């Protein structure tokens, strides 16, 4: 019995040493990625794909004394563009002649960003170095992020060895299969970026403009709201809450985001006017994105996120309405 116990303790000690070694190896790369995401000038083309759909996007990223700016141009013929200036994001949709303006969240960008500190992330993910590879002809360090439960996806990252810029990511499902991919096919690092390269080619004057509310709700405000979520997956906390006006929608939509520091889920609550045939009931998915919808007290609740179906269902079925005094 003592021998067995000694073997278990010895094995646990080795596992702990390996875990500590992995953490020590990954942390510098996360810090390097964080710096690269906000300190480099570059221009390139990346592909973003899920299922059989593949989109090609041109990106121009600039950092100067005026701040951080970015321009994304869709190469699929729609002419859609996304302009980022600090935390202000302008999305241009030529096909619907509309423009959406809102404030961005830290992770809502390309290339995808990841937390710089492992911290609480370790409670829900295992992080380790996973060898070397090349992307767009550039040497990279691979990092594997594995979930500790079935309520979130894993990630495989390819980080540029010289600059720390994230050049490729795979989002991995419960069977460790890629369900979404982001990858640079061409990248050029620049000394500076001309101002006109960050301006859209589209004349937006005759477009309809929609602007998100500029007064996000705090967690305390949510506690006073008529809506609350009784059960969240472990580690998930409110990241954002605000009212949106969505194109082709008359009534404003309440939008909340919950995150574990890596995965995020959006909850949309809107008045159900019984006129929309687009409302989702039950579960649905498109590639890595899962969704769950239901009606409640004359409202329609939709939960969407790049997480397993079980996660959006858990959150969707936990949304409740309460009468306030």
Regions found by a protein language model. Give the residues of each.
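Gly/Pro-enriched, hydrophobic low-complexity segments
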Residues: 136-205
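Short, surface-exposed coil-to-beta transition loops
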Residues: 54-58, 151-155, 167, 179-180, ...
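N-terminal leader/targeting segments and the immediate start of mature chains
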Residues: 2-68, 76-77, 104, 120-122, ...
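Short, hydrophobic/aromatic-rich segments at coil-to-beta transitions
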Residues: 39-43, 65-71, 137-144, 165-168, ...
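Short, solvent-exposed recognition patches
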Residues: 208-296, 310
């Amino acid at each position: 019995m003592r021998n067995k116990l000694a073997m278990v303790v010895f094995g646990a000690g080795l596992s702990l040493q390996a875990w500590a070694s992995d953490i020590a190896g990954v942390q510098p790369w996360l810090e390097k990625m964080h710096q690269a995401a906000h300190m480099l000038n570059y221009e390139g083309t990346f592909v973003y794909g899920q299922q059989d759909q593949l989109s090609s996007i041109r990106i121009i990223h600039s950092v100067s004394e005026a701040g951080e700016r970015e321009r994304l141009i869709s190469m699929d013929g729609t002419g859609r563009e996304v302009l980022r200036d600090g935390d202000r994001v302008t999305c241009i949709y030529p096909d619907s002649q509309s423009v959406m303006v809102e404030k961005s969240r830290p992770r809502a960008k390309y290339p995808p960003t990841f937390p710089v500190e492992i911290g609480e992330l370790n409670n829900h993910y295992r992080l380790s170095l996973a060898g070397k590879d090349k992307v767009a002809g550039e040497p990279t360090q691979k990092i594997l992020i594995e979930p500790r439960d079935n309520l979130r996806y894993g990630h495989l990252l390819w980080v540029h060895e010289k600059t720390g810029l994230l050049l490729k990511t795979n989002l991995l499902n419960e069977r460790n299969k890629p369900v979404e991919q982001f990858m640079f096919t061409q990248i050029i690092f620049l000394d500076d970026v001309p101002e006109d390269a960050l301006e859209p080619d589209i004349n937006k004057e005759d477009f309809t403009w929609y602007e998100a509310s500029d007064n996000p709700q705090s967690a305390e405000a949510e506690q006073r709201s008529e809506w609350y979520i009784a059960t969240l997956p472990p580690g998930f906390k409110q990241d954002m809450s605000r009212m949106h006006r969505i194109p082709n929608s008359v009534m404003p939509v309440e939008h909340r985001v919950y995150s574990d520091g890596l995965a995020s889920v959006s909850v949309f609550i809107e008045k159900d006017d019984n006129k929309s045939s687009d409302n989702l009931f039950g579960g649905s998915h498109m590639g890595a994105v899962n969704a769950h919808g239901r009606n409640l007290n004359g409202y329609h609740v939709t939960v969407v996120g790049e997480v397993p179906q079980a996660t959006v269902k858990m959150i969707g079925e936990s949304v409740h309405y309460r009468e306030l005094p």
